[in-house]
Amino acid sequence: MKHKILFFIFFLILFCSLGQTPCSNGFAGEYPCNNYDLLSHIPVSTLANNSGNPEGSDIWGWTDPATGKEYAIAAMTNSTAFVDITDPINPIFLGRLDSNAGNNYWRDVKIYDNYAFIVADNVGNHGMQVFDLKKLRDITTPVTLSSDVIYDNVTLNANLIANDRVNDLAVII
């Protein structure tokens, strides 16, 4: 019986550590690191849609003030992905918001007052997508999301700056 318990504990520890890769000699597995361990990984092929040759371009985060859940918001060349990272060893891909105007080299995301503001460069009339992050609370399986607002009076945007202290959002062209 003692050996069965030790065997069970060994496999429980092994199972719980899957996906975790320590940073060693500047790498966590195949990924460069700087004294940060890799806790888990979701490939771009899961996060982005299949249009073009998707790559990652930016990442931001949001903590839901009502639930305390933490989310990663990953900008891809063709979409923006939303991942529940409350348990960083077991992240949950919630869904994606596709680009408003095709693929681009750079997409930027900033958070202000529970909203994600998303811009892109080199895609014509992308404008600025606005997404209510509180919608993430009710998602149980991955979905394709929609913008709540598309502000189309701006084009070819490379960056956003959000300043919570003065309630200001600046679009950098």
Residue ranges and their predicted role:
Residues 1-22:
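Bacterial Sec-dependent N-terminal signal peptides
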Residues 19-173:
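Feature marking well-ordered beta-strand scaffolds used for ligand recognition
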